[in-house]
Regions:
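Glycine-rich phosphate-binding loop plus the immediately following alpha-helix
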Residues: 1-19, 158-182, 187-195
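Short acidic, glycine/serine/threonine-rich loops at helix termini
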Residues: 76-81, 102-105, 142-148, 168, ...
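Short Gly/Thr/Asp-enriched flexible loops that form oxyanion-binding sites at enzyme active sites
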Residues: 140-158
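Conserved small/polar residues in nucleotide/adenosyl-binding loops
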Residues: 219-225
Length: 229
């Protein structure tokens, strides 16, 4: 929880003198079921963040890769997002496209763990793919591996993926004239300085926050004068 939310909860608890006499509100309007409409809004929002749509339209189909949801939810929204963006030349790891909380094909469903990518890499070697992408079971983390010149695959660390993404985003924004003068990237305090050094070379500052997407997204309130890129 972000600070304001924590304060609100603490203040509410401070006003309770007897937990056994708390009035229970049975008004179910506080419960909102998230349905397909939210998925559609999310996919629509994704269309707005492609920094170089012309490049994607031209080259997206030529990128051949393998995707694994590691027995999780990523396949549902992931495939729609990929196809919508123009990345359609991919293969799904069928054995790992079945939702299963026991994660039968991996010891740990961590996409940054090389062992978790073994099946996807085998698919990539068989199909001649250039890269492998995997998401963790609840699809809020990812891992990747890329084909090297000798045909082997190198599993990238989270810091390496971040550095590649930052360099691409800032380069693309610079080339398209959309890099703001007061730009900033947001990283967590456990990240390496690799991405920050790249940002610095573009004249972009770095905001370090606590781990978790809630902390990253919270910067739109804490850094109102900085445009996050």
């Amino acid at each position: 929880m972000v600070p304001e939310a924590v304060d609100a909860v603490v203040n509410e608890l401070a006003g309770i003198s007897d937990i056994f006499n708390i009035a229970l509100d049975e008004d179910q309007t506080y419960v909102e079921v998230i349905d397909q409409a939210i998925d559609e809004q999310y996919l629509a929002a994704m269309k707005t963040v492609t920094v170089d749509p012309e490049l994607v339209a031209k080259e997206g189909q030529s990128l051949k890769f393998v995707y694994s949801p590691l027995h999780g939810t990523g396949q549902y929204i992931g495939e729609k997002a990929l196809q919508q963006a123009g990345f359609t030349n991919y293969t799904i790891v069928k054995e790992q496209a079945v939702i299963d909380g026991d994660f039968p094909t991996v010891a740990k469903p961590n996409p940054e763990d090389a062992a978790a990518l073994e099946m996807a890499i085998a698919y990539a070697k068989e199909t001649g793919a250039d890269a492998v992408v995997a998401t963790d079971p609840d699809a809020d983390r990812m891992g990747a591996a890329v084909r090297l010149a000798d045909g082997t695959f190198q599993v990238l660390t989270g810091n390496q993926i971040a550095a590649v993404l930052v360099n691409y985003l800032l380069t693309a924004k610079q080339n398209t004239g959309t890099l703001p003068d007061n730009g900033a990237i947001v990283t967590s305090i456990v990240s390496s300085r690799f991405a920050s050094k790249i940002a610095e070379s573009f004249g972009v500052t770095t905001a370090d926050v606590l781990t978790g997407f809630k902390s990253v997204s919270y910067t739109h309130l804490t850094l109102p004068t900085i445009c996050s890129v």
